UniProtKB/Swiss-Prot annotation:
It comes from Homo sapiens. This is EH domain-containing protein 3. It is a peripheral membrane protein. CDD domains: EH, EHD. Residues 65-72 are annotated as: G1 motif.
Length: 535
């Protein structure tokens, strides 16, 4: 009796099994989330329906900034080659959105042709009309960097009302559409002329739901002296603090991202370190792409649930016959109270609600009589997806991540800093002396020997206790000194001879100069007397 109840329970408890994360996301979206979105007209308010290409596409990087901040030059620097449609200059040059993607041959696909290609994730952009599509192209070219990621170049954000209106399409809305679908948003600022216009501020605010994807690049930093750079950096952080309302500080990378000589080379080491950090962040995108798509689907599901509660509440409050227009105005004006009631009744976080002002503007143009009442079954299916199916997919995400190499983006600028003497940190810190014929520690060994013979060596060795008295003078923490001891005690006898003691002091010097210690002792640091022992 009532066997259907048991079947429904079993279905809820046993999540679906998927072969890949991409396949799982597609099936969950189409079977569980899309029906809720369509029932409550989610796509008219927030975001168009997702398609297969949205789940299958490569990670995308969106570049945003005012004109002449170096967005197009940054892409050229990454690729180490020109791309079709590229224009660079001090004036506003890029007047189109350019999707730079991998292709067998160099060429440009115009926007109207691009939005009908089911293999590209841009089909829903046709909603922005011809004014936008005439300013949207895809630049295809064969490049090893583009085998792993795609890059979206955007028009420079201009100051002034005329420039904003004359675009003919909603620039902020287009950027928001891209922001939902990309893996990384890079905001570029020019260190030489730092200025955040009102239009740029509005764009950054429009991207506020995607702070986790945002990174900031302070470009052209080689054009100013160190003292000025500190002031510019401080001014940028202060300005961003007023625009981006998050307690966390957005990561800012300082550098000069082009292939020309540095104008003021004082901060070369800083620029190199910052460039490596940014490259590592971009290189992590393919590895984390599945997790990002899963995260975006969860975010979308939470918004769709809240949207369903809002629409059904408005439907419930509407009279069936008379006074509909007045009631509609009253409900729109009192939307904040409806938000508060839904928040209390359903224990929903305030951060899950859509922007109040924007929602009120959108509701003005809607016919409330066409809204649907609350359908619990649709919400239960989405809750079940979030509670069970997503957990199952998380396991699959970890499996896929573990099978991928750590650095997947290859070629272009990423290749030049990996190998040889121009690799980051080559010949510095523990790598100093890597190409020398002589043991690098031998330079300072006479000084270390003087200390060694004051520590009462027995049979040419000092005890761990005596070595510790000397090593703690460096004021390094015990955890660091313990690692140095482990690296220096090559024969593992718990004592140090003069070569091992000199090596320990060399490693202390490396650490005090701000470099990281290696996990294993490099071959060039092995004392000549110990090289046969190590073999």
């Amino acid at each position: 009796m009532f066997s259907w109840l048991g079947t429904d329970d079993r279905r809820r408890k046993d999540p679906e099994v998927f072969q890949t994360v991409s396949e799982g996301l597609k099936k969950l979206y189409k079977s569980k989330l899309l029906p809720l979105e369509e029932h409550y007209r989610f796509h008219e308010f927030h975001s168009p329906a997702l398609e297969d290409a949205d789940f299958d596409n490569k990670p995308m990087v969106l570049l945003v900034g005012q004109y002449s901040t170096g967005k197009t030059t940054f892409i050229r620097y990454l690729l180490e080659q020109d791309f079709p449609g590229m224009r660079i200059g001090p004036e506003p040059t890029t007047d189109s959105f350019i999707a730079v993607m991998q292709g067998d041959m160099e060429g440009i696909i115009p926007g109207n042709a691009l939005v009908v290609d089911p293999k590209k994730p841009f089909r829903k952009l046709n909603a922005f009309g011809n004014a936008f599509l005439n300013r949207f192209v895809c630049a295809q070219l064969p490049n090893p960097v583009l085998e792993s990621i795609s890059v979206i170049d955007t028009p420079g954000i201009l100051s002034g009302e005329k420039q904003r209106i004359s675009r003919g399409y909603d620039f902020a809305a287009v950027l928001e559409w891209f922001a939902e679908r990309v893996d990384r948003i890079i905001l570029l600022f020019d260190a030489h002329k730092l200025d955040i216009s009102d239009e740029f501020s509005e764009v950054i605010k429009a991207l506020k739901n995607h702070e986790d994807k945002m990174r900031v690049v302070l470009n052209k930093a080689d054009q100013i002296e160190t003292q000025q750079l500190m002031r510019v950096y401080g001014a940028l952080m202060w300005s961003l603090g007023k625009i981006v309302n998050t307690p966390e500080v957005i990561r800012v990378y300082i550098g000069s991202f082009w292939s020309h000589p540095l104008l003021i080379p004082d901060n070369r080491k800083l620029f190199e370190a910052e460039e490596q950090d940014l490259f590592r962040d971009i290189q992590s995108l393919p590895r984390n792409a599945a997790l990002r798509k899963l995260n975006d689907l969860i975010k979308r599901a939470r918004l769709a649930k809240v949207h369903a509660y809002i629409i059904s509440s408005l439907k419930k409050e509407m009279p069936s016959v008379f006074g509909k227009d007045n009631k509609k105005k009253e409900l729109v004006n009192n939307l904040a109270e409806i938000y508060g009631r839904i928040e209390r009744e359903h224990q929903i976080s305030p951060g899950d609600f859509p922007n109040l002002k924007r929602m009120q503007d959108q509701l003005q143009a809607q016919d409330f009589s066409k809204f649907q009442p609350l359908k619990s079954k649709l919400l239960e299916v989405v809750d079940d997806m979030l509670a069970h199916d997503i957990a199952q997919l998380m396991v699959l995400v970890r499996q896929e991540e573990s099978q991928r190499p750590i650095q997947m983006v290859k070629g272009g600028a990423f290749e030049g800093t990996l190998h040889g003497p121009f690799g980051h940190g080559y010949g510095e810190g523990a790598g100093e002396g890597i190409d020398d014929a002589e043991w690098v520690v031998a330079r300072d060994k006479p000084m270390y020997d003087e200390i060694f013979y004051t520590l009462s060596p027995v049979d040419g060795k000092i005890t761990g206790a005596n070595a510790k008295k000397e090593m703690v003078r460096s004021k390094l923490p015990n955890s660091v000194l313990g690692k140095i001891w482990k690296l220096a005690d090559i024969d593992k006898d718990g004592m140090l001879d003069d070569d091992e003691f000199a090596l320990a002091n060399h490693l202390i010097k490396v650490k005090l100069e701000g470099h990281e210690l290696p996990n294993e002792l490099p071959a060039h640091l092995l004392p000549p007397s110990k090289r046969k022992v190590a073999e």
